[in-house]
């Protein structure tokens, strides 16, 4: 068995939980290993009970796990909640009162050493120094990583705090969790939302707008930070309605455009989504799901908006709905969304969720492919005109996709309307024209379906059990499948990257080969199971649901599947 160490840092908002977790993650990469970090945080600015878990392995990590090997509790009041998750013989560190009884917890003087380092807020760095010693990470490595984060006097204080923590740990902390030396390989440290933003930029996004809404806000941060040097214009709008209308306007003018939001913001965008459908204007909407309804649980995870994304907006119009299942897929599918939205002149929805949004991994730079962007703007002789020389923005074509010119093309007036319209873009109430235009738009479904991303199948190509999921359940299903295989229960994992148009034929062919089919979903009603039934006519055997706001973990999922079989 290879390396598998799970470090969990806990504390209130403002105690530096995220900073410590991020530094420990980079320490693992610097030592030549891989990590998968997940965050669990409350919807408050200060206080609360937050955690940052870093799972370190000697091979790429696909999911977090429930049990911790090292627990660093920056607030000892959190120990009763987190202690049960520590696997024996785990190391538990916290700043206990002097009169606290001895037990499973190693009392570490985090506060005293933080003050000695120059600031009482440096307890997280003292604890990081202790963890570095437990993992066998050289202090010069930690110093180098700190220099990437801090400057001047505060850098020296952080370095001193780490040294004091590591010095205290000498002789007090067991070496059971030391990471063996491994060859360093350059890696990119990315969250799901950071990868999604980079994929959109690589896909040619030149305009982005949004109104902050957790867990989609960090997509906007990534776009606004990394996009402008590459020609992207970013606008923080007054609300989600304005954001999507701005993006549609930018797309009409020829810029690839996107927005990012969560469920409540997407609800406000529904009318503009229909506008994009009627105008046949390409636009990408990143929908970062969280538990609802209404405000729901802003900082928790869920997959409750699958059906909403597939049917939002009034009227009937084609759309593409993609669901990345990993940080790497967040990048590649964001690129794909930009390309497909313009190729088919449809809105494209990228479904992610808080779990994937905030998951951080070390990604292989070569796996994040940068390809040439293929623009599909009609120019010159490509612009269709009627007998009077007018541009036919909505020219009827066999595949439903009309040559798209943009304002500024010489001799061309680009007419677009939210009313039903004819080929020239001017509104109409002619029943015959209405039928032709509805059928024209609908023909895009065939093109989208022909280019549908097929389900990804791993494990036995046929047999007794298939586990089906979409989006962020990909990694946890894959690891749960491996746990079941070791226990003598062979199962296949089926991951859907595209849910609309649904890859019905491919999915039906796969599911026909298995006796028991279970969907794994972070919602109560089995929305994926309903979608499979509607699109293939197949009734799945059951649904493993979790809707408490927390993600599945591999061991828990494998246990529940065993109970179902």
Feature map (PLM): residue ranges:
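Active-site cofactor/cluster-binding pocket
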Residues: 1-203, 207
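Flexible, low-complexity linker and terminal segments
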Residues: 190-193, 333, 338-565
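A short helix->loop->beta-strand "cap" motif at the edges of active sites that frequently abuts
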Residues: 86-92, 103, 232, 281, ...
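Peripheral docking tails and interdomain loops at the edges
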Residues: 13, 110-122, 127-150, 313-314, ...
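Short gly/pro/ser/thr-enriched loop/turn and capping motifs at secondary-structure boundaries
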Residues: 42-45, 99-101, 113, 217, ...
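Gly-rich Lys/Arg/Thr-decorated short loops/hinges at beta-loop-alpha junctions or inter-strand turns
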Residues: 171-185, 200-205, 223-230, 286-288, ...
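Thiamine diphosphate
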Residues: 2-66, 70-83, 207, 214-311, ...
């Amino acid at each position: 068995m290879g390396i598998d160490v799970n470090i969990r840092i806990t504390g209130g908002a403002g105690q530096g939980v995220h900073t410590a977790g991020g530094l420990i993650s980079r320490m693992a990469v610097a030592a030549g290993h891989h990590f998968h970090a997940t965050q669990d945080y409350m919807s408050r600015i200060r206080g609360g009970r937050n955690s940052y878990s870093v799972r370190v392995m000697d091979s790429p990590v696909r999911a977090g796990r429930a049990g911790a090997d090292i627990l660093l509790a920056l607030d000892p009041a959190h120990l009763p909640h987190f202690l049960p998750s520590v696997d024996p013989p785990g190391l538990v560190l916290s700043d206990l009162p002097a009169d606290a009884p001895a037990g499973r917890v190693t009392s570490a003087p985090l506060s005293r050493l933080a003050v000695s380092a120059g600031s009482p807020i440096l307890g997280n760095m003292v604890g990081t120094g202790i963890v570095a010693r437990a993992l066998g990470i050289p202090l010069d490595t930690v110093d180098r990583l700190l220099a990437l984060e801090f400057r001047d006097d505060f850098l020296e204080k952080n370095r001193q705090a780490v040294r004091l923590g590591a010095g205290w740990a000498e002789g007090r902390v067991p070496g059971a969790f030391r990471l063996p030396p491994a060859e360093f390989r350059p890696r990119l440290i990315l969250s799901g939302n950071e990868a999604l933003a980079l994929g959109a930029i690589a896909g040619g996004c030149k305009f982005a707008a949004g109104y902050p809404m957790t867990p989609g806000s960090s997509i906007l941060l990534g776009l606004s930070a990394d996009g402008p040097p590459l020609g992207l214009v970013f606008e923080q709008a007054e609300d989600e309605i304005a954001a999507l209308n701005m993006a549609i306007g930018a797309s009409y003018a020829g810029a690839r455009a996107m927005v990012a939001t969560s469920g409540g913001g997407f609800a406000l965008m529904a009318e503009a989504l229909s506008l994009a459908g009627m105008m046949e204007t390409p636009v990408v909407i990143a929908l970062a799901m969280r538990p609802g309804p209404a405000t729901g649980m802003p900082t928790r995870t869920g997959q409750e908006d699958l059906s909403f994304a597939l049917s939002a907006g009034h009227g009937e119009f084609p759309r593409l709905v993609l669901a990345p299942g990993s940080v790497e897929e967040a990048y590649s599918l964001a690129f794909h969304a930009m390309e497909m939205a313009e190729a088919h002149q449809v809105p494209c929805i990228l479904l992610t969720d808080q779990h994937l949004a905030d998951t951080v991994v070390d990604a292989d730079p070569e796996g994040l492919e940068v390809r040439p962007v293929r623009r599909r703007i009609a120019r010159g002789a490509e612009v269709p005109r009627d007998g009077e020389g007018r541009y036919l923005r909505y020219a009827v074509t066999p595949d439903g996709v009309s040559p798209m010119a943009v304002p500024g093309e010489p001799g061309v007036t680009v007419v677009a309307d939210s009313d039903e319209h004819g080929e020239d873009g001017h509104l109409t109430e002619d029943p015959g024209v209405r039928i032709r235009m509805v059928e024209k738009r609908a023909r895009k479904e065939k093109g989208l379906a022909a280019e549908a991303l097929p389900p990804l199948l791993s494990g036995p190509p046929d047999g007794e059990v298939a586990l089906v999921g979409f989006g962020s359940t990909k990694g946890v299903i894959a690891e749960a499948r491996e746990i079941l295989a070791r226990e003598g229960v062979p199962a296949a994992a089926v991951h859907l990257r595209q849910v609309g148009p649904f890859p019905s034929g491919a999915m039906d062919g796969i599911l026909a080969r298995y006796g028991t089919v279970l969907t794994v979903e972070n919602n109560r009603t089995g929305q994926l199971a309903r979608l499979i039934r509607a699109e293939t006519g197949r009734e799945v055997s059951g649904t493993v649901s979790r809707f408490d706001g927390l993600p599945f973990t591999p061991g828990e999922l494998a246990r529940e599947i065993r109970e179902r079989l």
